[in-house]
A protein has these predicted regions:
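Short, histidine-centered active-site or binding-site loop motifs used for metal coordination
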Residues: 41-44, 188, 253-255
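Short glycine/acidic-rich loop motifs that flank beta-strands on beta-rich extracellular proteins
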Residues: 67, 80-81, 101-103, 145-149, ...
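Extracellular "leader-to-stem" segments immediately downstream of a signal peptide or signal-anchor
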Residues: 1-178, 183, 194, 208-210, ...
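Carbohydrate-interacting regions of secretory-pathway proteins
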Residues: 166, 226, 275
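Alpha-helix capping and helix-loop boundary segments enriched in small/acidic/polar residues
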Residues: 46-49, 224, 228, 259-264
Length: 286
C-alpha cells in the first residue's frame, strides 16, 4: 500500500482539500473480495465458443446468493455484453482473458450515453449501473477484440469521410453509470471496438496500475479513448499506462447548443490523474 503524509495540506486548483480517499491505493486480494465463482467450475470452458448466456447466468446466481466475485482463470473466454449486479465483482487471473465477441449483434441495443447525449446505442462488454462498491481487478486481460469494427469504420470513412461514431456504431469495453466506490485495478484493458472505459454520473472511482491499450497500426483503432469521465466527481487515475488511438483521459459533460441546460449534463469535479505513463495517443488529457 502506498501512503503519503496526509497532514500536508494539498488542494485542487479551486482550493478544495484533497482528502485521504485519494491517498489510499490498497487493492484487496481475491480472497477478500468475496465468494469465488470460477468460470471453469461452472462448465464455462476455454473452448472458443461464445459463453455470454452462461457467464451472465453465473453473475445472476452470485447476486441471488448474496454476492461474490466472478473469476476468469487462465485461458481465453469469449463473451458478448455482460451486466453486473450489486455485490458481484470481476477478477481476471494471471493468464486469463475475457474476450469480447467481434459480432456487434452480441451487444444488445440499450438506452445509454454517447457523445454527450442520451440515446440508443450498443451496450458495452462490461456494464454496471447503480452499483456501490463494484471491483474489477486482477493481473489478467479484458480484450474487446475490436479489429472487425475498426475495419468496418475505416471502410465507411473511405466513401463517407464525414461519418461519425453514431453512424458506425460499435460497443465500448467498459461502461459504468450511476456507480460509486468503484475500483478498477491491475488489469490489461485492450482492443476496444470504441471507447475503452466510460464513466457516467459516477463518483469515487479509482483506476490503479492499469494498462489500457489500442493500436495505431497496422489498423488504427478509431475513437478508443482510454478513460472517458462524464459528469463525475472524485476520480483517481494513478500509475496507469495509457496508449490508444485517440485521447487518453477525456473530460466530458455534454455536447451541442443546449449542453449547459440539459439536466443529464454537468461538470466533472475533483479529478486527479498522477504518476501515469503515456504511449501513443492524440492527447494525454482533453
Amino acid at each position: 500500500m502506498e501512503t503519503k503524509n496526509i497532514n500536508v495540506c494539498e488542494t485542487f486548483p479551486d482550493g478544495t482539500p484533497i482528502d485521504g480517499w485519494f491517498y489510499d491505493t490498497n487493492v484487496p486480494s481475491l480472497e477478500k473480495i468475496g465468494k469465488q465463482y470460477v468460470l471453469t467450475a461452472y462448465g464455462i470452458l476455454d473452448d472458443g465458443k461464445l459463453h455470454t448466456k452462461e457467464i451472465q447466468a453465473l453473475i445472476d446466481l452470485a447476486a441471488k446468493d448474496g454476492g461474490g466475485v466472478i473469476v476468469v482463470p487462465s485461458g481465453t473466454y469469449l463473451t458478448g455484453a455482460l451486466f453486473f449486479k450489486q455485490g458481484v465483482h470481476l477478477y481476471v487471473a494471471q493468464g486469463g482473458m475475457l474476450k469480447g465477441s467481434d459480432d456487434c449483434s452480441d451487444y444488445p441495443i440499450c438506452e445509454t450515453r454517447i457523445e454527450g447525449e442520451s440515446c440508443l446505442y450498443f451496450s458495452a462488454l462490461i456494464n454496471a449501473d447503480g452499483l456501490d462498491g463494484f471491483v474489477m481487478c486482477g493481473p489478467g486481460t479484458i480484450d474487446g477484440n475490436g479489429m472487425r469494427s475498426w475495419k468496418a469504420f475505416w471502410l465507411r470513412r473511405s466513401w463517407n469521410p464525414k461519418c461519425t461514431n453514431k453512424d458506425e456504431q460499435r460497443p465500448r469495453l467498459v461502461y459504468l453509470s450511476n456507480c460509486k466506490n468503484v475500483l478498477i485495478a491491475d488489469l490489461n484493458l485492450q482492443n476496444s471496438h470504441f471507447w475503452t472505459t466510460h464513466l457516467y454520473h459516477c463518483d469515487h472511482v479509482k483506476y490503479l496500475n492499469c494498462r489500457i491499450f489500442s493500436p495505431a497500426s497496422p489498423v488504427k483503432a478509431p475513437s478508443t479513448d482510454a478513460i472517458d469521465i462524464d459528469v463525475c466527481s472524485d476520480i483517481l487515475v494513478k500509475n496507469c499506462y495509457l496508449e490508444v488511438n485517440d485521447d487518453s483521459v477525456v473530460l466530458k459533460g455534454g455536447k451541442g447548443p443546449w449542453a449547459d441546460t440539459a439536466p443529464e449534463n454537468g461538470a466533472n469535479e475533483r479529478i486527479l490523474v498522477e504518476d501515469c505513463v503515456y504511449g501513443f495517443c492524440h492527447g494525454c488529457l482533453t
